[in-house]
Every structure is written in C-alpha cells, then in structure tokens.
Design a protein with these regions (language model features):
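Surface-exposed edge beta-strand/loop patches
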Residues: 29-38, 131-174
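Short, solvent-exposed, Trp/other aromatic-anchored flexible loops in extracytoplasmic proteins
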Residues: 100-156
Length: 174
C-alpha cells in the first residue's frame, strides 16, 4: 500500500513538473479592442478654400464650406486577425438630405494605418454647408454607424460590434 502511494505521488509530481516546463503557448482570453471615435468639424483655411472647385455655385465664400475629420482608433489589436472596419457613407447621407436639393459632400479622402497594438482609420471630407446649421450637420454625422469585425488569433473566435459614429463631435469656431 505504501509503495502505491509513493508511486502515485511520484507520478503526480512528474506530471506537474512536465506541465510547468511545457513550451506550448498558453491560450489566454484577450478582451475586445478598445474603440474610440472622434469627429471634428472646422472651417477651411484660405489655402484649402483655394483648392475647392466652386464654379458651379453662385457667390460662394470660404464660410460656406467646412472640413470634417473623423478618426476611429482600435487599441489592443495585437491579438486580432482579419480586422474589418466599415465607416458610414457620408457622401450619400449629406447628398440625400430631406428637403434639400443641394450637393453637400464636395470631396474627401481616407487613410488606414496599422501601428503596434492599434489601428487608426481616418476620413476627411469637405462639405458645402451654406444654409446648414451645426445641429443639422451633427444630426447627419450622428446617424452613421461604424461596423467592425475581427477574429481572435488564439481562439479563432469571430466578433463584431457596431458603434455610433457621432459620439464625440466637436465644432471649431468659424
């Protein structure tokens, strides 16, 4: 009986020691990425206004235009794979305003940047805002939804989330 107990303890200690020395990566539970969205609406500079094509408009001025800058940051992306982000279609939203026949979305650009443990998605566009107030602009920006999806590298689990695009909208003085 004593030999069986000693043998069992010896076998148990061997298993514990071998488990501790294992080189296999331990799977950990990584949380979803942290998401932040910021939107800034500001007047154009003189230089920016000089680059805007205004021939189709009657008596346009620099004050009739605004630049919108949207930044989405995903932090904690080192453990994620197949990250996909779909930002709102602001061109469609601004050009199809109810009771407004004006083309509002003038032009825009965007960039996606992967850094260490974070991804940054930037969109910038120029709006023709004559006869629009800040609240109307904010309402249209706020209706947009940002859709994200990703997989966890260690578990292959797929996740997706939707965020309000208009959470942090700041207007800079005209």
């Amino acid at each position: 009986m004593n030999k069986k107990v000693v043998g069992f303890v010896y076998a148990l200690l061997t298993v514990i020691i071998l488990s501790a020395c294992s080189t296999e990566e331990v799977t950990t539970n990584h949380s979803d990425p942290q998401v932040s969205v910021s939107t800034t609406v500001k007047p154009l500079t003189k230089k920016e206004f000089s680059e805007v094509e205004i021939s189709e408009l009657t008596s346009p001025s620099k004050q009739d235009f605004r630049k919108v800058h949207v930044v989405l940051t995903l932090r904690g992306t080192d453990y994620l794979s197949n990250i996909q982000v779909k930002l709102p279609n602001y061109k469609q939203a601004f050009n199809n305003m109810k009771d407004d026949q004006q083309i509002r979305y003038w032009f825009g650009s965007g960039a996606d940047e992967e850094q260490e443990n974070k991804n940054i998605y930037t969109r910038e566009f120029v709006l023709y805002t004559k006869n629009l107030n800040d609240q109307q602009i904010k309402d249209i920006l706020a209706t947009g939804k940002i859709k994200t999806s990703w997989g966890l590298k260690d578990t292959k689990t797929k996740n997706q989330e939707e965020f309000a695009a208009g959470k942090n909208i700041k207007f800079e003085a005209k």
